[in-house]
Amino acid sequence: MSNQHTLLMFNLLPVGLNISTWWNFGSMLLTCTALQTTTGFFLAIHYTANINLAFTSIVHITRDVPYGWIMQNIHATGASMFFICIYIHIARGLYYGSYLNKEVWVSGTTLLVTLMATAFFGYVLPWGQMSFWAATVITNLLTAVPYLGSTLTTWLWGGFSINDPTLTRFFALHFILPFIIISTSLIHVMLLHNEGSSNPLGTNSDIDKIPFHPYHTYKDTLMLTTLLTLLFITTSFFPNIFNDPENFSKANPLITPQHIKPEWYFLFAYGILRSIPNKLGGTMALVMSIIILLTAPFTHTSHVRSMTFRPMAQVLFWTFIATFMLITWAATKPVEPPFTTIGLSTSILYFSFFIINPLLGWSENKIMNTHN
């Protein structure tokens, strides 16, 4: 009987009539989480968290374990798909003013930070050249913290350099964090259903709602099928498209790669870090590049929630998206002109969005009041 009530609640869940495809990325992210947790579990069964055996254990998984290559490729490519979905999900939130639902936005930003930490720890696990050196560069940023820096770094490493204890604890963290992501996701969804989704018009949806099933279930299924098709095509035909060639060599502390860079989904933050010549300043800018999202609900000044009817805000938004892509591209290049200049100017533009947007909202209100 209780099952019937659960089904009824799910079937009759009222959802806004006019939410577009951009609202499908939440369910896609949930699918990515399930996929990553499942494949990650099977990889963890065969993985060995030891600096002498980690690289070999990955080779063993891809060569000797039945269907190990599928597990490994789906897990690696799935991470990229996860980030593509989450960046679109955040962009949707910024464009349509979803951030005005403060609790949902704050829990979402927490999820993003946790996801980035999980992905970073996971990138270190294969113990390839880029894994080792990316870990060295990023963990070294802790030394920029005044007074406590060196102590924190030594504590995180479990010694005076990145070594076996570091890999062991990174594996432990990479294993536990997805469960924190799952529980935070449940809180995120619960908070969302307190108020309900926004919609492309930015208006209240209460006057016109439809049942979640069958309308939105089929809509979600279509996008999930598209996501999985893209994932399987990439995994089958271009399995190493997101991998760094350096990572196919075992970690060697004596040889530094010519150009150390993290995975593509961290490049925007890495580009901002790299564009500031001061270590502490760069570290603060790196943290702020993500934490600044938290300011969005508190700096919204426009009387209109969504950017659908705000042409100037749309120009600003798409400039921000282009800036994001440009930082990502510039961060893949060596530290030399003109890339240093591009990195610096795009970093300034990136942060400018969060300053100009409230000013633009304020000026729009002035114009509307004048015409009234």
From Swiss-Prot:
Cofactor annotation remark: Binds 2 heme b groups non-covalently.
Major location category of this protein: mitochondrion
Stored InterPro entries: Cyt_b/b6_C, Cyt_b/b6_C_sf, Cyt_b/b6_N, Cytb/b6-like_sf, Cytochrome_b, Cytochrome_b_C_euk/bac, Cytochrome_b_N_euk/bac, Di-haem_cyt_TM
GO CC terms, sorted: mitochondrial inner membrane; respiratory chain complex III
Keywords (A to Z) from UniProt: Electron transport, Heme, Iron, Membrane, Metal-binding, Mitochondrion, Mitochondrion inner membrane, Respiratory chain, Transmembrane, Transmembrane helix, Transport, Ubiquinone
Pfam families: Cytochrom_B_C (PF00032), Cytochrome_B (PF00033)
Record-linked SUPFAM superfamilies: a domain/subunit of cytochrome bc1 complex (Ubiquinol-cytochrome c reductase) (SSF81648), Transmembrane di-heme cytochromes (SSF81342)
Gene Ontology molecular function, alphabetical: metal ion binding; ubiquinol-cytochrome-c reductase activity
Residue numbers binding a ubiquinone: H193
Coiled-coil portions: none
Cofactor: heme b
Membrane topology field: Multi-pass membrane protein
Annotated GO biological process: mitochondrial electron transport, ubiquinol to cytochrome c
Iron among keywords: yes
Residues that hold heme b b562 according to the record: H75, H174
Cell compartments where the protein resides: Mitochondrion inner membrane
Family: Belongs to the cytochrome b family.
Subunit field text: The cytochrome bc1 complex contains 3 respiratory subunits (MT-CYB, CYC1 and UQCRFS1), 2 core proteins (UQCRC1 and UQCRC2) and probably 6 low-molecular weight proteins.
More details: Heme 1 (or BL or b562) is low-potential and absorbs at about 562 nm, and heme 2 (or BH or b566) is high-potential and absorbs at about 566 nm.
Stated role: Component of the ubiquinol-cytochrome c reductase complex (complex III or cytochrome b-c1 complex) that is part of the mitochondrial respiratory chain. The b-c1 complex mediates electron transfer from ubiquinol to cytochrome c. Contributes to the generation of a proton gradient across the mitochondrial membrane that is then used for ATP synthesis.
Protein name in UniProt: Cytochrome b
Organism in which the protein naturally occurs: Heterodon simus
